[in-house]
Every structure is written in C-alpha cells, then in structure tokens.
UniProtKB/Swiss-Prot annotation:
Binds 1 thiamine pyrophosphate per subunit. It comes from Escherichia coli O127:H6 (strain E2348/69 / EPEC). One of its GO terms (biological process) is menaquinone biosynthetic process. Belongs to the TPP enzyme family. MenD subfamily. The gene is menD. Pathway: Quinol/quinone metabolism; 1,4-dihydroxy-2-naphthoate biosynthesis; 1,4-dihydroxy-2-naphthoate from chorismate: step 2/7; Quinol/quinone metabolism; menaquinone biosynthesis. Homodimer. This is 2-succinyl-5-enolpyruvyl-6-hydroxy-3-cyclohexene-1-carboxylate synthase. Keywords: Magnesium, Manganese, Menaquinone biosynthesis, Metal-binding, Thiamine pyrophosphate, Transferase. SUPFAM superfamilies: Thiamin diphosphate-binding fold (THDP-binding).
Length: 556
C-alpha cells in the first residue's frame, strides 16, 4: 500500500466534496505537509486557483473573493504557524458573513507534543470563531469514504456565514507516484463522482418572517438606518425609505446614495437630534455602522421599537435597544414589508444635510485627504467598484462624500483592522473582474505591503491610492495624551512607496495637485494593470478639517 497515493485519494474526496457546495475559488500557500490537498486541488478542473506566499494575506485574499462571489472560498495551508496566520481573516468573515473553508494540513497525532518540527496543537486553535470545526483522522481505508464526504457535507450544508476549519493530518511519505491504492475505497461512492450534488444534503430552514404589525408601524414616524448591504439592496432600501417618507441615514457601505449626505456631520447638530427624537420606530437594515456621531445617536435614541434586519445571526446592537432582531435577507424582508406612500415628516434634517454638504464643498479645493474623501465619487471607474480601507480614510469618506446609489463598495468593517486590506482588495478585483479603486492609509499599506505581489495579477484596471499622512492620524481625533501621541499612537514611519511599487513592477505616481491626480487616473483606467498613487498630505490636515467641519455644522 502506498501511503502517499492514499493521502491524495483521501484529499481528492475532500476537494470534490467542496465543489458540491459552490466552491470555485481556492487559495493555496506553499507547503510540504499540505501536498495531498494541493495536488488534489490542482487536478480538479472545477477550481480557479490562487496562490500567495503569505498565509495572512492569502486568508484576506479569500475574504475578498468571498465578498464579491457570495460563495464559499477554500484556503489550503501547511502545518504550524501557517495556520495561525489565517486567524484575522477568519475573525473578519465571522463578523461580516463571508464563507471561508480553511483546509489546514497537520502532522499525524504521534508527532504532536513530542518536539517534532512544525508540529503544533491545531485542533480547536481558532476557539469559537469558526462556525464548525472538524478534526479529521489520519487517512485510512478503515474509515469509509462515505463517512468522510458526509462529514464535510454536514459542515458545509449548514454553513450560512463565517468559517469552517477542517484540520487534515497526513503521515509521510507525502510524495510518490500514484498507484492503485485506494481506488476501490473511492469507488464505493458510486456515481457520486459523476454527479454534482452533495452526498448529504442539509438545507437549514431560513425564511423571512413577516411582522404582522408592520401595517401599523409603517404609518408612524420612522427612521431608516442603512448599514452594510449589497449594491442592489442599497437601491431598494433608498426607494423604500423615500416611499415611507422616513429619513434615511446611510452608512458609507450602504450603497443607498446617501440621500441625506454628511450624516456624521449633521448628527452633531442639536436641531437634527431633536427632530429625530420624534421617531416612534427605527428600522436598521444592515450592520457595521461607521460614523462616530451615528453610533452616538444610535446608542442614545429611545424609539418605541428598534428593529435590526440582517442576514447575519447574533446580536448586532451594542446599545441593547428594546425591539426586534430579525434574521433575514434584506431584499426579501423589504418585499414582505412593503412601504406605504407617505409625506416626509422630517423638515429640519434635509436642510441641515444640504448645508453640511455645502460646507464641505466650500473646502474642496485644497489638496488634502479630507478633500480627496469628498471628491472620491468623481474618481470612481465606470462599471467598477470601490474598496475602502479602515481607520481615518473610511470615516472621512463616510462623513464628507456622497457615493452613487447602487455603486458597489467593499471594506473590512467587521473587526475593522488595518491588516490584510490590500490582499482583500485583490480578492475583490479578482472575483468581479471589474475596474477597482482602492484607497488606504500609509500604515495600512505598510502592514500588507507584500500583497503588492497579488496586485501584479489583475484582470481589469486597479488603482491603489495610498494616502500618506505619515502615521495613524486617526489618533489625532481622540483625546490621546499630547506628550505621548506621536511616539506611542501616531508612530510616523517617514516612508514613501515609490520603491515598493518598483520592486513589484507596478506603475507609480505621486501627484502634487488635483489636475495631476485626475490625469493619472484617466491613464490608469485605460490599461488592465495596477497603478499605485501615493498622495502625500499634511500630517494633521485631514483630522483638523473634519473637526472644523463638525464644529461649523453643529452651529448651523
């Protein structure tokens, strides 16, 4: 019997089972212990293969692929700390609803806890973050193939969001020619090999439930809060709120068109919050709210009912309102809860939103990051998409811009880390094939710098704007101690990205004014390659501009 041959047949069953659950994209890092999985994936024509040498970036690449495809994405890594590098992407997927399947190769049990190389305790290492964890046994013909495939099917058939961890120990030898070992073991699955359905089908019942008193509540004074959702859902939510006559407070990730723009500015005005106090019901569609003033209002508002509608399970209200947590697809829920045409009940807020936007426009000429955030809608590629980084940049865009309704926007706003942002953007572009504008800060770019290797492989123009404000300037918005702020919070690195782009053979520009930036963008959208645009700005201007606008709008 050939151990290496049976390892591969065992792995082939695992990989084939994944295809029955919609897995098409598979991300592979180099490694020896994962050889059976890698070769099985390489031989399966159902997969689109992606490779990367950094497992942390690989996990985020998979995250980006899953965001766009809405399908589970598989990841293959070798044993040891390679597995631990998948933790950040797994955590993010659990919070934002993407489906990841982590296939982690492992040493066999006799090599654990005995000083063997690259052998750590992998089963259960992700604690409660996966929705399902499987610790497979060492491949053996004593275990029927139907057990293996039904075990995989059970985990994936009930996967609605988040990650599945499948730990796969393999004994040596890992290499060798294929022989007849294990053929009869595989063949006991019969015509499953020619089918395209799971061996075991488990479909959890998830049907939106109609709120029987909706006809009553839709006649009341309501507010719609729109969080993270799809582009198509964003357009439907905007129309729904408009029909009801309810004010819509749209997050940067809502894709609603933000009909009341600059919400994170005007929510700091007492006239706005006073008018919102008249609301009898708040319906929040989607989670992961960005704006600080929005979160403050959300925490302090006290309507008679607060409903949160999101496809993700669990508690999504840090303010713990009395109300309803409705687990449903947003589009399906809207269909079950039609709007009734009513006149808008808010008078003050539309005026404040218009005045706030005019205040922003009055400052748009200076060459800075706040102004870039406001102008970003002018720079979006046609039929494209936007990927927004975390920290200060996403808050500026949320507060100062008005993105088009239905224009796809992606971000990692679950755990809101700055790790893996370039890798996630690469996955977003690959899965969609669309022109992509990505915008991140300098520390975020440094954190994921080797992901520039992934950006060499794009199928449409990708522009990466790195806003270089020399450190974590978001801490300028917080009451951090001035004497320790620069060293312990901002951590300026005094670097530029020209040589990094050159190392990965990417086009690079550092415009000094808006005309140069716009000329660079026109050229960049013409070719299916990556262009790195470094926008060097004054360290504190972005944060100061936001603070000045907040003060100005609060006194309107």
């Amino acid at each position: 019997m050939s151990v290496s041959a049976f390892n591969r047949r065992w792995a082939a069953v695992i990989l084939e089972a994944l295809t029955r659950h919609g897995v098409r994209h598979i991300c592979i890092a180099p490694g020896s212990r994962s050889t059976p999985l890698t070769l099985a994936a390489a031989e399966n024509s159902a997969f689109i293969h992606h490779t990367h040498f950094d497992e942390r970036g690989l996990g985020h690449l998979a995250l980006g692929l899953a965001k766009v495809s809405k399908q589970p994405v598989a990841v293959i890594v070798t044993s040891g700390t390679a597995v631990a590098n998948l933790y950040p992407a797994l955590i993010e997927a659990g919070l934002t609803g993407e489906k990841l399947i982590l296939l982690t190769a492992d040493r066999p049990p006799e090599l654990i806890d005995c000083g063997a190389n690259q052998a750590i305790r992998q089963p259960g290492m992700f604690a409660s973050h996966p929705t399902h964890s499987i610790s497979l046994p060492r491949p053996t013909q004593d275990i029927p193939a139907r057990w293996l495939v039904s075990t995989i099917d059970h985990a994936l058939g009930t996967l609605h969001a988040g990650g599945v961890h499948i730990n796969c120990p393999f004994a040596e030898p890992l290499y060798g020619e294929m022989d007849d070992t294990g053929i009869s073991w595989q063949q006991r699955l019969g015509d499953w090999w020619q089918d395209d359905k799971p061996w075991l089908r488990e479909a959890p019942h998830r049907e939106s439930e109609k709120q029987r008193d909706w006809f009553f509540w839709r006649q009341k004074r309501g507010v719609v809060v729109a969080g993270r959702m799809s582009a198509e859902e964003g357009k439907k939510v905007a129309l729904w709120a408009q029909t009801l006559g309810w004010p819509l407070i749209g997050d940067v990730l809502s894709q609603t068109g933000q009909p009341l723009p600059c919400a994170d500015l005007w929510l700091g005005n007492a006239k706005a919050t006073s008018e919102l106090q008249q609301a009898q019901i708040v319906v929040q569609l989607g989670s992961s709210l960005t704006g600080k003033r929005l979160l403050q209002w959300q925490a302090s508002c006290e309507p008679e009912e607060y409903w949160i509608v999101d496809d993700i399970e669990g508690r999504l209200d840090p303010a713990h309102h009395r109300g309803r947590r409705l687990i449903a697809n947003i589009a399906d829920w809207l269909e079950l809860h039609p709007a009734e045409k009513r006149q808008p009940w808010c008078v003050e807020i539309p005026r404040l939103a218009e005045q706030a936007m005019q205040a922003v426009i009055a400052r748009r000429d200076a060459f800075g990051e706040a102004q870039l955030a406001h102008r970003i809608s002018d720079y979006l590629p046609e039929q494209g998409q936007l990927f927004v980084g975390n920290s200060l940049v996403v808050r500026l865009i949320d507060a100062l811009s008005q993105l088009p309704a239905g224009y796809p926007v992606y971000s990692n706003r679950g755990a809101s880390g700055i790790d893996g942002l370039l890798s996630t953007a690469a996955g977003v572009q690959r899965a969609s094939g669309k022109p992509t504008l990505a915008i991140v800060g300098d520390l975020s770019a440094l954190y994921d710098l080797n992901a520039l290797a992934l950006l060499r492989q794009v199928s449409a123009p990708l522009v990466l704007i790195v806003v270089n404000n020399n450190g974590g300037q978001i801490f300028s918005l917080l009451p951090t101690p001035k004497s320790e702020r620069e060293r312990f919070y901002l951590m300026p690195q005094n670097v530029h990205f020209e040589h990094a782009a050159a190392m990965f053979e990417l086009k690079y520009h550092s415009p000094q004014n808006w005309q140069e930036l716009e000329t660079t963008l026109v050229d960049a959208w013409r070719t299916p390659t990556t262009t790195v645009i470094e926008m060097v700005v004054n360290d504190t201007d972005g944060a100061q501009t936001l603070q000045q606008l907040l003060a100005q709008v609060s006194h309107l």
